[in-house]
Amino acid sequence: MEKKSLFQRIRQSLKLDDEMDEAQIRKAAGLIRNIFRYMDKDAKDIMTHRKNIVAIDATETLEDAFQFMLGESYSRFPIYEEDIDQIIGFIHLREAATCYLDESLRKRPVKELDTYIRSVSFIPETKSIDKLFKEMQAKKNHI
């Protein structure tokens, strides 16, 4: 497989050619601006501050947690024990819905759904975004 430069990948993904319309040119320019804007940033510059994290207490029942999740605009939810600094993993809304279909699981605490709880990576605040994105891509990690 041929390795392509970043520019070549952008060009291919946006299908850049001589017949680009104005909207495509704006989209390409915005993408390139965003790449350069974040190249010299660290993880702390894009992390969600702990007071803004929408998370689920591990002792909540699946029923309560699922209702909470449906009221939010996220698809992945960290799960914590005792306080927000004790993240034990995260659950995807789609997997919570699968569990919810099984009525026998609805009254169980979320922490007991261990086959559906995914592990989280702990990222140093000083890690460069460039390195972080490469690691996340390699691991196919979206959170």
Tell where the protein language model's regions lie, with residue ranges:
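Soluble cytosolic regulatory domains appended to membrane proteins
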Residues: 3-143
